[in-house]
């Protein structure tokens, strides 16, 4: 489980390495931060799977602590989400967060989000 005292959260490989050296037990790669860092845009569904997989690979290769990766809505339907999880596992993600929003998603900090039906879960 997430514990603020044991988990670092930031965006890049250097921050993950610093978190590890500071004694954090895990590192969270937040989608909103990656979107801002890589593309300079809000977390509104612009990032693609390749962006997230490549970034996760860089972060995972820089540290020995588990990384948790925000995958937004999984990049499509259930089959796309399955494929996304496989790609992120191969990239080194230890845990994956998948939002239950309809696609295209809205940034989690904003109002007006819609979630998928329970049957989709």
Stretches found by the model and what they are:
Residues 17-36:
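N-terminal glycine-rich anion-binding loops that anchor highly charged ligand groups
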Residues 40-69, 91, 109-121:
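Alpha-helix-loop-beta-strand connector modules within alpha/beta enzyme cores
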Residues 30, 34, 91-93, 98-112:
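Active-site-proximal loop/short-helix segments
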Residues 11-13, 32-33, 72-76, 101-103:
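Active-site beta-loop-alpha junctions enriched in small/polar residues
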Residues 5-10, 74-80, 114-121:
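Active-site glycine- and acidic-residue-rich loops that bind
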Residues 1-9, 13, 17-22:
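N-terminal amphipathic alpha-helix/helix-capping segment at the start of soluble metabolic enzymes
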